């Protein structure tokens, strides 16, 4: 059996909603977003997504849901996870 694996490049956009903190002027500090995202990015970057637990069928929709579920506890105010495969093709996920 011949198996040809191919790679994809995705743009992941995370949207956070909430009140603006009067002391900082932020809804969320982008460094906090980066820290929450970094372990997931490291886990997903240049890997075979089918081998990632929970991503055995790594459609864009299921990838967005997987990211949401992985981030919701560490990123308060998470409102939307977007996965873009191209400039005009992508999905958005929220709960």
Where are the regions that the model predicts?
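Charge-rich, low-complexity N-terminal segments
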Residues: 3-95
């Amino acid at each position: 059996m011949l198996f040809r694996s191919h790679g994809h490049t995705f743009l992941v956009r995370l949207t956070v909603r909430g009140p603006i903190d009067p002391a900082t002027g932020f809804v969320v500090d982008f460094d906090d977003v980066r820290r929450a995202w970094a372990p997931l990015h490291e886990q997903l970057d240049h890997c075979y997504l089918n081998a990632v637990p929970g991503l055995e069928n790594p459609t864009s929709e299921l990838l967005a849901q997987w990211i949401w579920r992985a981030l919701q506890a560490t990123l308060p105010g998470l409102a939307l996870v977007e996965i873009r495969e191209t400039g005009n093709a992508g999905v958005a996920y929220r709960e």
